[in-house]
């Protein structure tokens, strides 16, 4: 399959932040997680970056919205941080039983932390226990509706189950929370292109990823060019627009 390295990296991108996960007062998030529940394609066009121009027509530098999860502040006990790091290390070493024990202990010692629930979900995914993983990720979102990592993990797991529209709905929730989430745009583009056969939607969100990351990923640039050849639609979010380049006045 084309660009397999990009797919492998991007579908994991939402979970690479090493954080124990703060707690917040969260409202109920309406997630479509039951695989037997019908899911319909929802529009995600409203979450695309919209560069602005000044009175001369010059593009202004784009100011991306901040990650709402990282903007949260909270105190986490030092011993919890150490235990969380140990759990992540055990997971990386495929010591799933030990990792699960540590994450479970963290959920019992501090019932407000969302991060350990993501960890439990990751353990379940590694063992292909997808339903259990989904339950853990949903719990993380219930505890902290701004934990963007949980949405990414949930969508990835739904994709692994073959529930592609459910995954699309979850990525839409992530972008509603943080419209300038680069990895959510890229993962959604992959989903649109490879699994849902919506190349134009894929192009728009892959453009968004390139725009928000200054076009640093050359593999994605090649993929985007290939999609654009298929759609025949010109690229609308040119990376150079972020540098306030002038456009001709009509």
What are these regions (language model features)?
Residues 91, 118, 125, 159, ...:
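Position-specific recognition of the canonical hydrophobic site in helix A of tetratricopeptide repeat
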Residues 111, 145, 179, 214-215:
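Short coil turns that delineate tetratricopeptide repeat
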Residues 88, 122, 156, 190-191, ...:
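Residue-level recognition of tetratricopeptide repeat
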Residues 73-109, 122, 126:
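Alpha-helical segment of the N-proximal tetratricopeptide repeat
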Residues 85, 119, 153, 187, ...:
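Canonical tetratricopeptide repeat
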Residues 93-101, 126-139, 161-173, 197-205, ...:
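Structural signature of tandem alpha-helical TPR/SEL1-like repeats
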Residues 194-250:
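Terminal, low-structured helical/coil segments at or just beyond the last alpha-helical repeat
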Residues 116, 150, 184, 219-220:
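TPR alpha-solenoid repeat register
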